[in-house]
């Protein structure tokens, strides 16, 4: 399969913070622990082995065995769960929401990056074991972010009748209503072996499991179980009890807010945007009905928009009795993950890494080893036919990533039989007016303003003429312009990265297991570039 790649800066889709992190800019070195290079994992292993509470392993295995009890578990996943008992076993984690039928393509890229990094670590450090973990965001409550997927330019949306949707953790929501989505999906995906696998996976996942959490675990296991992926839903009381001391310090001392405030000021002073601003208390109170913020006022604690309240002593007792009711938010969830897992590295997208970079001082204050942070692989999938079309249109890979009007203007200028670039004329005009400025200074300086006004007017006139000629030439080259726009629209649905829009089923129905196999082969988590992968020839 032909593979092409471009650098992340050339895509124009990554923020300055992430690009500077990838280039190991010195000013950012205080915001992370170790840069994710294979040689640096040795020290990370040593540190995590020393700092991790290995007694948690027993509870972790028990919880995983319970969560996998109704699934067909592959030999590789079973071996990985069992291996977690050993002090020489470590994890690599990616986290993701419970998007309907995995959501956009980058769900696959996240998990494949994670699996492939564990393989590389095993080669480099064979005396240890490395387990790829998918941390399901079962406690998120933003239902509108996850209740749809895009296939063939159409949006397949789940209208959940559960009135708790959007109010409490999505993992516990009923899968009711997904039979309607299944009918529409089945009609769209058609027939054939690959289509039957997709329909079967959707049907067994959502129509034979009662909760979104169980359904998502089934689907992720169907796709990635044979590679040894281990899926964690961390809301279990047996795991939450190990986070009690950290939740206590958050409630009483507002530790995450206190520790990250200075970091945010430093990040801001370097000219970067802040990804997440912490609240005073970065915890939710979670029940079957609600997930609402915990607020402190005058030494007492309240649950936002409810009648629930406690004194300090009462909330600490509630924490001791029901740790599962205290749900971390985006600022505290990373700490929880690193407390309960023997983890070395977190793999995420640019937005995720941006908020992780805010947290190092918080981890240090809580005496938890800060993991290495690795940007997940990114890719664009194209057909051989699309690649041929691009080459015929003489569009480079880099040009594909331009804004559409920039791409079209550039190509029209290039293929036009007349020169529509007036840069030379503008430079000549500026030179001519320089003589007039000199003349005005020598005669009467009050004329300088008039000269300037005339210069601006004439430059604007040239601009206007250039745009009119370009527009006329676009009309003349209408077919060419339409082919360019059509190709880019196909590869960048909704003028966005394909990986953030298109569901994997659109490609799986065509290429089946080849899709997963080729992604496993081609996506190198330690290779810092954006891949363009070509499937099939016509």
UniProtKB/Swiss-Prot annotation:
Any Pfam family: CC_BshC
Primary enzyme class: ligase
Any one GO MF annotation of this record: ligase activity
User: Which segments does the entry list as coiled coil?
Assistant: 462-533
Keyword Metal-binding in annotation: no
Question: InterPro entries attached here?
Answer: Bacillithiol_biosynth_BshC (IPR011199), CC_BshC (IPR055399), Rossmann-like_BshC (IPR055398)
EC number(s) given by UniProt: 6.-.-.-
Query: Family, per the entry?
Result: Belongs to the BshC family.
**Name of the molecule in the record:** Putative cysteine ligase BshC
Native source organism of the sequence = Christiangramia forsetii (strain DSM 17595 / CGMCC 1.15422 / KT0803)
């Amino acid at each position: 399969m032909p593979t092409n790649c471009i650098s992340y800066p050339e895509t124009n889709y990554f923020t300055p913070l992430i690009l500077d992190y990838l280039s190991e800019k010195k000013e950012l070195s205080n915001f992370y622990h170790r840069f994710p290079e294979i040689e640096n994992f040795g020290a990370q292993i040593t540190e995590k082995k020393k700092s991790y509470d290995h007694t948690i392993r027993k509870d972790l295995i028990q919880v995983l065995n319970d969560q996998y009890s109704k699934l067909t578990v592959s030999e590789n996943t079973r071996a990985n769960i069992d291996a977690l008992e050993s002090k020489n076993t470590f994890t690599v984690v990616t986290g993701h929401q419970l998007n309907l039928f995995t959501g956009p393509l980058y769900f696959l890229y996240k998990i494949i990056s994670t699996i492939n990094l564990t393989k590389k670590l095993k080669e480099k450090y064979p005396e240890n074991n490395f387990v790829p973990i998918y941390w399901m965001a079962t406690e998120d409550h933003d239902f509108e972010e996850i209740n749809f997927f895009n296939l063939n330019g159409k949006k397949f949306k789940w209208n959940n009748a559960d009135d708790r949707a959007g109010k409490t953790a999505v993992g516990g929501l009923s899968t009711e209503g997904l039979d309607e989505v299944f009918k529409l999906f089945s009609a769209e995906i058609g027939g054939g072996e690959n289509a039957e696998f997709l329909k079967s996976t959707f049907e067994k996942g959502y129509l034979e499991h009662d909760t979104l959490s169980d359904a998502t675990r089934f689907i992720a296991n169907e796709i990635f179980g044979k590679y040894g992926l281990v899926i964690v839903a961390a809301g279990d009381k047996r795991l939450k009890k190990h986070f009690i001391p950290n939740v206590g310090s958050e409630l009483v001392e507002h530790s995450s807010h206190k520790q990250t405030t200075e970091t945010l000021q430093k990040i801001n002073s370097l000219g970067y945007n802040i990804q997440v601003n912490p609240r005073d208390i970065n915890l939710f109170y979670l029940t079957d009905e609600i997930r609402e913020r915990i607020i402190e006022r005058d030494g007492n604690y309240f649950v936002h928009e409810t009648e629930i309240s406690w004194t300090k002593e009462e909330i600490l007792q509630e924490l001791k009795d029901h740790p599962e009711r205290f749900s971390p938010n985006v600022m505290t969830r990373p700490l929880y993950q690193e407390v309960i897992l023997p983890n070395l590295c977190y793999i995420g997208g640019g937005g995720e890494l941006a908020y992780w970079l805010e947290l190092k001082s918080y981890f240090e204050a809580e005496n938890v080893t800060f993991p290495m942070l690795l940007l997940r692989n990114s890719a664009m999938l194209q057909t051989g036919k699309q690649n041929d079309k691009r080459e015929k249109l003489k569009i480079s890979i880099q040009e594909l990533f331009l804004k559409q009007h920039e791409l079209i203007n550039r190509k029209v200028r290039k293929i036009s039989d007349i020169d529509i670039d007036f840069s030379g004329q503008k430079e000549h005009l500026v030179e001519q007016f320089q003589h007039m400025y000199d003349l005005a200074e020598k005669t009467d300086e009050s004329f300088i303003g008039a000269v300037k006004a005339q210069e601006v007017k004439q430059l604007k006139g040239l601009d206007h003429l250039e745009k009119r000629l370009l527009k006329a030439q676009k009309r003349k080259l209408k077919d060419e312009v339409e082919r360019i726009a059509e190709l880019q629209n196909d590869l960048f649905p909704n003028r966005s990265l394909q990986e953030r829009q298109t569901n994997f089923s659109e490609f799986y129905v065509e290429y089946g297991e080849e899709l997963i196999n080729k992604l496993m082969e081609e996506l190198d988590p330690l290779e810092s570039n954006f891949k363009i992968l070509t499937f099939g020839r016509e």
